[in-house]
Structure formats: structure tokens, C-alpha cells
Amino acid sequence: MKKVTAMLFSMAVGLNAVSMAAKAKASEEQETDVLLIGGGIMSATLGTYLRELEPEWSMTMVERLEGVAQESSNGWNNAGTGHSALMELNYTPQNADGSISIEKAVAINEAFQISRQFWAHQVERGVLRTPRSFINTVPHMSFVWGEDNVNFLRARYAALQQSSLFRGMRYSEDHAQIKEWAPLVMEGRDPQQKVAATRTEIGTDVNYGEITRQLIASLQKKSNFSLQLSSEVRALKRNDDNTWTVTVADLKNGTAQNIRAKFVFIGAGGAALKLLQESGIPEAKDYAGFPVGGQFLVSENPDVVNHHLAKVYGKASVGAPPMSVPHIDTRVLDGKRVVLFGPFATFSTKFLKNGSLWDLMSSTTTSNVMPMMHVGLDNFDLVKYLVSQVMLSEEDRFEALKEYYPQAKKEDWRLWQAGQRVQIIKRDAEKGGVLRLGTEVVSDQQGTIAALLGASPGASTAAPIMLNLLEKVFGDRVSSPQWQATLKAIVPSYGRKLNGDVAATERELQYTSEVLGLKYDKPQAADSTPKPQLKPQPVQKEVADIAL
């Protein structure tokens, strides 16, 4: 009996010692100036900015997976488009009088020019290497059929010619010309079908995963930067001095560590909302999220791939979210060309591709449940669209492909599940809650923590989004002569608009094209087109947009 008692006492002491050791390990605080949560393109971009602006600041990046750029930034988990509104028709909505609004298109294009300048600067510094590994010239095209859609594209083309950012765009309604631009799209098509297309040679395909890996690899060369993989944030607590204590679990050995940070950035993609809620800042209460996934059909058949060099976007059908429009794209992934068609919406309660089925439920709180319900009730057409997408059969997806590639063969294509996108739902005083397309930087009043919510245009505008975050959180420093000079070295057009300034637009496009190895020819005169008939549009309930 004494032996048993002694054994139990010994085990209890041992377990207590292990427990105390674990607690001691968790209580050992690592201190850092900046904590970057998430190993994607947003954290990598912000870290790169801060490395130039404040090289002495210490930075720590924590990533839940075993490597960086494995979620939404991964090339296979997104469309890889350098979004600049050259072909995306949802950025040029039609007004009630039939005219075309280009304000959103101009803003998107301006933002992408900042990304191009940021990447070019990093190439010149040796931070990014071999531009062809992450960005390639792929012409951007819009393609439509039917009298009304052709008339819309005419009006869109005419409206965009008023901006210096869209000079060089071509327009045609000629079958032979469009076939020369995009053979796959035209071969086998009814020669009597009314079609129209625009084409811009300076479009790009971008591998955001490769950019992310290279940016982080450069950051790792500095002794005051630390990357911790397989590390999951479990808790965030504000301290009395407005620093943050963040508890991080090592998923490989089960230990925990506390990191004390002066500034925290939550760039965790779909997981950002839950972490923002965990922080307890009042600004988080206005937000909820709704996850939507995307699938693509993929072809690696050389007969298909070598016959198509463009990204071709169509027009969304009536009742579908504008951003959901199908497109057939040349991609450069893992060093080789492939063709993708989609996206097709999917549904999962996960906020990340590698997330938990409990993500949606665990992010629903008493403060955001009502906005979510209002969005569902106000956007029944969107709900119907998502249900119809989830119910698509293999044959349905193939028929959708044949609208863009009439001679497609089933055996050339396979289905790929891309990443998850968490759509922003924000509390609204009038409607209760609204679905917001785009990204949004949410920060506390003290500027000690910030999160990026939303999905589109996302990675292609990482540089301007993080620039916006710097202005919002580090406003005093941004206005200082030192930071101003550095930011203008990184982004030459910082603080001014390119739109309307032909010389400045051409200068920046020429510069970034040369450094990034992209095609650029000075624009010629605009194509002559039939005059669009601006017909008043019937009043229709606006369909909320989502990003896939």
C-alpha cells in the first residue's frame, strides 16, 4: 500500500512539474515591435514596407500552417489576376440613364499601378527576383454576346477612353479579329452571333504566392525578424500600456508562448474576423462574415494551353452577383502555363480552406447575428444564386465552359477546389446589415491593432491596401519628412493621381514594365466603334456582389 501511495504521489508531483513547466514556458514573453499574424501577401507586404521605413523595428510573423502562402495567397487558390478593371465589367456599372460609370474602374486601376510600382521597387532592391517567376504579360479581354450586351460594351469602351489609364484598349465586333485575339473563344461559334470584345495588351497574370514567399525570404535575412510556422494564435489581450500580449500555440509540440507586441496586424485571411473579435476592441462588433468558396475547371493539355493567351471575362447573367462572372484564363503556375475556367461558387462553413467547420458558428455573436439575418433577408436573389451554384452537376459546369469555349472536350478538364473567401457583413443604421464587396482595414482608436477583412480585389491591391493601413495607424509618422521620402521612393506616384495625366501614366507604365519584364507599347489612337445607344435601364433590385 505504501508503494502504491508513493507511486501516486510521485506521479502527481511529476504531472504538476510538467504543468508548471508548461505554464512557465507560456509565461516567458517574447517582445517584438510588430507582430504579423498570418503568412500571406498582406503580412508580407506590410512587413516589407516597415522594413524600409523603420529598419530597426523588430518583427515577428506567426503562421498556422507549415509554410507561408499556403491559403488564399497560394497561386492555385485564387484567379491570379492583376485586377486593373481592364476587363472586369462589374467595375463599370450602368446608370439608370444608360450611361457607364467608370469611377470604380479608375480607382481599381490606380490601385494596381501602386502595386506594380511597389513590386518594381522591390525588384530593384533585390528583394524580389526573376520577375517572370511571379508576373507575366497576359492580355485582358472582355467578351460579350447579344445585342444589349454588345451595346453595353460599346458604351463602356467609349467611357473608358476618357481616362489616361485605359488608353491602348482595343475594341472589335469582327469575328475574325476576335478569333485572332482569342481563338478558343471563337472557334466553333455561330458566325451569325452578335459578339464584341475589348483587349488590352498590358494585362497581367500574377502568382501572389511566389511574391509572398520571396518577400518573406528577404525579411528572414534580417536578425530582427522572426518567422514562426505551425503556430496558432489562441488569445489576444490588451495591456495597460496599450501593448498586446498574444498567446501562440506551437501545433507540433503543444507548448504555448506569449508574445508582447507594440503593434499587431491581423492578416490571417478568413481567420482575421475571429481574431479581431478575440481582441475585444469595440470596432469589431460592427462586423460579421459569410464564407463562399470557389471551384475552377483546369486544363493542362498543351493543345488547349498553347491555343489561348488571354484572360477573357464575360458579363454576369441577370440575378447573379456581378463579380461572379465566368472567365477563361491563361495562368502561369509552378513554372508552366495552364488554362482555368470559372469560378463556380461552393459553400462551406469554413473560413479557410484549411479551417474548421465551426468557423461560421463560432464567429456569430449577439452583436452581429442581426446584421447577418438582415443581409440574408435583403439578398434572397443572392441566396438563390449560391444554392443554384452548389447544385451544379458536372454537365452543368461543362455547358457553362462551352459558352466561352464552344469546342471544349470533357477529357481535357479537371475540377479544382480553390480557396475560401469571407465576405464582409457590416452593421448598417438603415438596413440593419449590408454585404460589402472589397477589403476593409479595421483598427482600434489607439492604432495598436489592425485587421484586414474582405476578399476583393485583394492580393492585386495589397500594396495600396497596406499603404492605407500605414496612413490610418501610423498617421503622424506617415506625415513626417522621413517617411514621406521613403514612401515616394517605394511608390513614385504616391500622393497624386495618374488618371488624367497622360505623361505621368505613360512614364509609370514604362518604368514598371521595364523593371518587371512586361510588354508595353505606347497607346495608339482609339478604335472607331458604332455609337452606343444609351437606353434608360429598367429599375431592378440591386444584386449584392461577392468575391469568389
From Swiss-Prot:
Stored InterPro entries: FAD/NAD-bd_sf, MQO
One GO process term, biological-process aspect: tricarboxylic acid cycle
Pathway where it operates: Carbohydrate metabolism; tricarboxylic acid cycle; oxaloacetate from (S)-malate (quinone route): step 1/1
Cofactors, names only: FAD
Catalytic activity: (S)-malate + a quinone = a quinol + oxaloacetate
Keyword Flavoprotein: yes
Gene3D superfamilies: D-Amino Acid Oxidase, subunit A, domain 2, FAD/NAD(P)-binding domain
Comp. bias intervals (Low complexity): 530-541
Chain intervals for the UniProt region annotation (Disordered): 521-548
GO MF annotation, one: L-malate dehydrogenase (quinone) activity
Domain of life: Bacteria
UniProt keyword annotation of Transmembrane helix present: no
Record keywords: FAD, Flavoprotein, Oxidoreductase, Tricarboxylic acid cycle
EC number(s) reported in the record: 1.1.5.4
Family listed: Belongs to the MQO family.
Protein name: Probable malate:quinone oxidoreductase
Native organism taxonomy: Bacteria, Pseudomonadati, Pseudomonadota, Gammaproteobacteria, Enterobacterales
Gene behind the chain: mqo
